[in-house]
Design a protein with these regions (language model features):
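Catalytic-site neighborhoods of secreted/periplasmic enzymes
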Residues: 1-43, 83
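Active-site regions of oxyanion-processing enzymes, predominantly non-cytosolic
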Residues: 2-14, 45-103, 149, 161-170
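C-terminal cap/loop subdomain of S1 sulfatases and analogous C-terminal strand-loop tails that border
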Residues: 9-13, 177-183, 227, 232-284
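Catalytic-adjacent loop/helix segments of enzymes that bind and process anionic phosphate/sulfate esters
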Residues: 27-70, 81, 124-125, 133-144
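A short beta-strand-to-alpha-helix junction
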Residues: 44, 107, 139-147, 191-197, ...
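Short beta-strand segments
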Residues: 67-74, 170-175, 202-203, 246, ...
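Short, solvent-exposed loop/turn segments at secondary-structure junctions
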Residues: 72-77, 94, 129, 134, ...
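Histidine-centered active-site microenvironments of extracellular/periplasmic hydrolases
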Residues: 78-81, 159-213, 222, 272-274
Length: 284
């Protein structure tokens, strides 16, 4: 659990590998003054590689019937990727950021845009110019970090297959939030646009669950549906106080009756002690 660990284990690992830094944020600066320059650490020593190594080391001593909650931090700001992932994709091949007309703007948009800017997505570039070139470069780094994550998930899947556990293992891949990446001139996650809250959810069911693989569900779902889905697939009773609904019927191609027609996403724009940028903007 890298988030609860706050990178302490990885920081210790880097120190043991003779990486020089006083504070952890320094390791997230690229090696020179280009935002898409490689990270100071190698791909073998990245936080993504470190967590995967730790997971595989731990799984080798686990008896069957284990459960692993593997929280990869990247891709997440600050955006910096080790070679070769920093230059794996070309900025000029990135999708162009979406724009919004003045007439379609919401009153929350102006303070939201100021809450996080492109310079806040990287370390060491406080005077970073806000422009399409910057957006494309950061997007290319982000996609490179996804490619790195994909490679390490592949390591986990290969190990599961080599140990003949892949078929019987339930695998759930999702994220707690998305990233705006310059869409509508917004950065970070504190927004109501799809880029911030429309996150992926991929489920690889155990072989014993009969259904068609590769199904794409078009119906609405929420992150709170993940827990009841896992419990349902494992044959464990779902407590009455669980808010979500099991997605298991969809895996069996049986859409539940009266399935939800709407979902809820929540962003806390306020703070009772220190006024947020939104509270200050609207005088709340």
């Amino acid at each position: 659990e890298m988030r609860f660990d706050t990178n302490k284990s990885w920081k210790k690992y880097l120190k043991e590998k003779n990486y020089k830094f006083d504070k952890l944020f320094e390791i997230f600066e690229p090696i020179d003054k280009k935002i898409n320059a490689p990270a100071k650490y190698s791909a073998d020593d990245s936080d993504t590689a470190f967590l995967t190594d730790s997971l595989l080391k731990d799984l080798q001593i686990r008896k069957k019937g284990w459960c692993a909650h593997v929280t990869y931090v990247k891709p997440h700001p600050p955006f910096v990727a080790p070679a070769p992932y920093n230059s794996l994709l070309r900025p000029n091949e990135m999708p162009i950021a979406h724009k919004i007309s003045t007439n379609d703007q919401h009153p929350f948009d102006d303070p939201s845009k100021q809450f996080r800017r492109a310079k806040d997505m990287v370390i060491g570039f406080q005077n970073l110019k806000e422009c399409s070139k910057t957006t494309a470069e950061i997007r290319a780094i982000y996609m490179g970090l996804i490619a790195e994550l994909d490679a390490h998930l592949g390591r986990v899947f290969r190990w599961l297959k080599e140990t003949e556990q892949y078929d019987e293992t339930l695998i759930v891949i999702t994220s707690d939030h998305g990233e705006m990446l310059g869409d509508y001139d917004c950065w970070g996650k504190m927004h109501y646009f799809d880029g911030a809250f429309h996150v992926p959810l991929m489920i690889k069911a155990p072989k014993g669950l009969q259904g068609t693989h590769g199904i794409k569900i078009k119906e609405q779902s929420e992150s709170i549906d993940v827990t009841p889905t896992i419990l349902d697939i494992m044959g464990i009773g779902i407590p009455d106080d669980i808010d979500g609904s099991s997605l298991k019927p969809f895996l069996l191609e049986k859409k539940p009756k009266n399935w939800k027609k709407s979902t809820m996403s929540e962003v806390d724009f306020g703070d009772p002690i220190n006024p947020t940028i939104w509270q200050s903007h609207f005088g709340l």
